[in-house]
Amino acid sequence: MSFSNSKDKSVVAVYKLVKAPIYSHCFSQDKSILAVTCETDCLVYRVSNNTPPVLFATLKDHDKTITAVDISIHGRIVTCSQDRNAYVWEPLSDGTYKPTLVLLRINRAATSVTWAPNGYKFAVGSSARIIAVCYYEHENNWWVSKHIKKPIKSTINCLSWHANGVLLAAGGTDGFMRVFSGFIKGLDSKESVAGSPWGQKFPFGCLIREWYQGSYIHDVEWRSQMERIAYVAHDGTLNVVDYQSPVQSVNAPEGLPYRSLVWINDHEIVCGGYSCHPVLFSEASEGWKFAKNLDKSDNNKSSALTASGNTDELSGNNDESSTFGISALRKFKELDLKGKVSTDVQESAHENAIVELRPFAESNGQITQVSSCGLDGKIVIYTI
C-alpha cells in the first residue's frame, strides 16, 4: 500500500491499495469508511485525513469476482458478484460485519448494485436480462427481490436511482437507456412521485421511457432536481436527456470510451474511462462541450530519440489527434534501442483505465472532489 501526491494540482491523493483491478469502490456518508472490490473479497478500510487507509475488515463470502459494492446512508454494505449472489453486510459494534444472503433468483452474474437514497432497498443489475429490486422483509427476516424483466434484452451494466427512490435508470449491452419504476408497495409512498413530469402512475416494473443509443451503456447518473439523466456509452459519447427533450451528445476528445460519470453541478459533468484521466464537460448555450482535462499525462514534453538519429519522423504534428500515435511510436522505439522509456513525462495518477467515479466532497450543492478506482488497483481523489 502506498500514499502519494501527484505533481498535478487536481490530484489530492493516490492510494495504491491492491495488486489487482478495483472494479468498484464506495465511501461511507462521513467518508470514514472505504470499501473496495478485490477479486473475490471486499476490503473495508478506515480512512482519516492525510494518512493512508487502514484495512480493518475483509468480507469473504463470495466465491467469484465481486463486480460492485455500495454503502447505504445507514452504513450497510451491499456487494454483488459473478457467483450470482448479493450480500448485505451489517456493521457490528466490534468493527466486524454480519453477512445476510439476498435471494436474487438469477442464473447469470450480478453486474451492478446501488442503494436507493433512503437506504431501505437496492437494485442489482445482471447478465440474466433482469434487474432485481431488493428490500428487507421483516416477517421472514431476510432480503427478498422483485424482478424487472421486460423489455430488457441483454446484460444490465449500470443503474441509478432518482432522488425520489422510485424511478430507476438502467443501461446495458442492448444499446438502450431505460427508466423503470422501482415502486415497492408498503415501502414507497405515492407522495414521493406526486407531480412528477415522468408520468402519473408508477406500478412496479413499468417502463417509463427508453432511448436507443446503439452501443453499450457503461454508466448512468440522475440529476434529480433538473429531471435529467446523463449516460456514457462505448461509442465514446457523453449523452444528456430529460423527459421531453431529445438526447444531447458530445464526443470524447480523445475518442476513447468513458466508463463512469459524476454530475458536478447542474451544468458540469466529469467523466473517466480508457484515457486514464478525468475529463470535464460543461453546458453552454449551444449545448454540451469539452471543458478541460484533469491530470492528463504530458506526452508532448517527452524527449526526442537521439540514439537513432532520426528525430524528424517523430516531430510531425503536435495536434491532439496525432499525440497518441507519436507517443506510442516513441515509447516502443525507446524500449527497442535503450531498453527503457524516457522518464521526463508527467504521467497521470492512474496507469490504467478508470472504472468508476464517485462524488467525494461537496460544497453549496456542488461537487468539489471526486474519487476514482481503476484497473491499476489505485484509488485517486481529484479536485475539480
Curated annotation (Swiss-Prot):
Record's GO cellular component terms: actin cortical patch; actin cytoskeleton; Arp2/3 protein complex
A single GO molecular function term of this UniProt record: ubiquitin binding
Keywords, in A-Z order: Actin-binding, Cytoplasm, Cytoskeleton, Repeat, WD repeat
Role description: Functions as a component of the Arp2/3 complex which is involved in regulation of actin polymerization and together with an activating nucleation-promoting factor (NPF) mediates the formation of branched actin networks.
Family: Belongs to the WD repeat ARPC1 family.
PANTHER family per UniProt: ACTIN-RELATED PROTEIN 2/3 COMPLEX SUBUNIT 1, ACTIN-RELATED PROTEIN 2_3 COMPLEX SUBUNIT
Compartment(s) where it occurs, according to its Swiss-Prot or TrEMBL record: Cytoplasm, Cytoskeleton, Actin patch
Gene Ontology biological process terms from the UniProt entry: actin cortical patch organization; actin nucleation; Arp2/3 complex-mediated actin nucleation; positive regulation of Arp2/3 complex-mediated actin nucleation
UniProt key word Repeat: yes
Chief location of this protein within or outside the cell: cytoplasm
Lineage, broadest ranks: Eukaryota, Fungi, Dikarya, Ascomycota, Saccharomycotina
A Pfam family hit: WD40
Bridged cysteine pairs (disulfide): none
InterPro entries in the cross-refs: ARPC1, WD40/YVTN_repeat-like_dom_sf, WD40_repeat_dom_sf, WD40_rpt
WD repeat extents: 61-99, 105-146, 151-190, 212-251, 349-383
Assembly, per entry: Component of the Arp2/3 complex composed of ARP2, ARP3, ARC40/p41-ARC, ARC35/p34-ARC, ARC18/p21-ARC, ARC19/p20-ARC and ARC16/p16-ARC.
Protein name: Actin-related protein 2/3 complex subunit 1
